[in-house]
């Protein structure tokens, strides 16, 4: 397997008082966060807490309602060409062969580098096949190659392994970790799998009701051995916080739920 040519150091990120609202609903509330260049950060939390919204803001797919996103002293939007986002679905075009999916949107002489990145993810021999011939894990490898060919400094991962079987998921985790160590880009991984977050990240963020409720450093050597006592203890710490949030957070959650139910009842009465 060949090595992809050097990718520049990762993008540093600063969030200053970031908020995001959809109508009257606040999804992200006054986020303050600094991520150093090349750091691997995992973001966990309950469904609807704002994890994926955060990634969309960082990718430039949506604008924040409040605050500023920075990369160093410049706006993060200036680094948009160096940012790539991977989704849970590989989103390959079925009418284009694997190599053409990797080079999608590129001009000039890109095919040699496309073959190189496919080799990096272990799929050089599938370059001229159709996506329909690939397994779910192989499709995600193609999606990863499609991101790598752009030489990203910031890689955003929105549950990219969530639909894979357990063994394929472990293999993909190892591949992502090796590529990150080799090339030094900054990674933000959104995942519902706390064990995955602990195994891969330098740092785990827990988002609760649109705010950062926990910021936990994972100061363990790599490669990390699954099932180790230290990993299990960290996983238990995060899970306990996810399942048993502080009283203020839970009261806020119940208040929002009651408010929504009250609004729905009022609408039914009015009708």
Swiss-Prot record:
Enzyme class: translocase
Purpose: Part of the ABC transporter complex SsuABC involved in aliphatic sulfonates import. Responsible for energy coupling to the transport system.
Protein name as catalogued: Aliphatic sulfonates import ATP-binding protein SsuB
Compartments, as annotated in UniProt: Cell inner membrane
Species per Swiss-Prot/TrEMBL record: Yersinia pestis
Biased composition (Polar residues): 260-271
GO molecular function: ATP binding; ATP hydrolysis activity
Segments forming domain ABC transporter: 13-234
UniProt family annotation: Belongs to the ABC transporter superfamily. Aliphatic sulfonates importer (TC 3.A.1.17.2) family.
GO cellular component, as recorded: plasma membrane
The protein's Enzyme Commission number: 7.6.2.14
Reaction it catalyzes: ATP + H2O + aliphatic sulfonate-[sulfonate-binding protein]Side 1 = ADP + phosphate + aliphatic sulfonateSide 2 + [sulfonate-binding protein]Side 1
Membrane topology of the entry: Peripheral membrane protein
Region (Disordered): 250-271
Alphabetized CDD domains for the sequence: ABC_NrtD_SsuB_transporters (cd03293)
Keywords: ATP-binding, Cell inner membrane, Cell membrane, Membrane, Nucleotide-binding, Translocase, Transport
Subunit structure: The complex is composed of two ATP-binding proteins (SsuB), two transmembrane proteins (SsuC) and a solute-binding protein (SsuA).
UniProt entry tagged with the keyword Iron: no
Residues annotated to bind ATP: 45-52
């Amino acid at each position: 397997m060949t090595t992809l040519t050097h990718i520049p150091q990762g993008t540093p990120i600063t969030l200053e008082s970031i908020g995001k609202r959809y109508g009257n609903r606040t999804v992200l509330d006054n986020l303050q966060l600094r991520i150093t260049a090349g750091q691997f950060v995992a973001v966990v939390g309950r469904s609807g807490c704002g994890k994926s919204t955060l990634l969309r803001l960082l990718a430039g797919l949506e604008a924040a309602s409040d605050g500023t996103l920075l990369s160093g002293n410049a706006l993060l939007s200036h680094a948009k060409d160096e940012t790539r986002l991977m989704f849970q679905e590989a989103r390959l075009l079925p009418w284009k062969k694997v190599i053409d999916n990797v080079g999608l949107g590129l001009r000039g002489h890109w095919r040699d580098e496309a073959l190189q990145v496919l080799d990096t993810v272990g799929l050089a021999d599938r370059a001229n096949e159709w996506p329909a011939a690939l397994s779910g894990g192989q499709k995600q490898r193609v999606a990863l190659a499609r991101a790598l060919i752009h030489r990203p400094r910031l890689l955003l991962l929105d549950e990219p392994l969530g639909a894979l079987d357990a063994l394929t998921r472990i293999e993909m985790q190892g591949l992502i970790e090796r590529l990150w160590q080799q090339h030094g880009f900054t990674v933000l991984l959104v995942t519902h799998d706390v064990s995955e977050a602990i195994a891969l990240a330098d740092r785990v963020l827990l988002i609760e009701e649109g705010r950062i409720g926990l910021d936990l450093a994972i100061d363990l050597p790599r490669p990390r051995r699954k099932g180790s006592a230290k990993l299990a203890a960290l996983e238990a710490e995060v899970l306990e916080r996810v399942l048993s949030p502080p009283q203020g957070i839970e009261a806020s959650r119940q208040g929002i739920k009651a408010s929504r139910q009250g609004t729905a009842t009022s609408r039914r009465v009015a009708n």
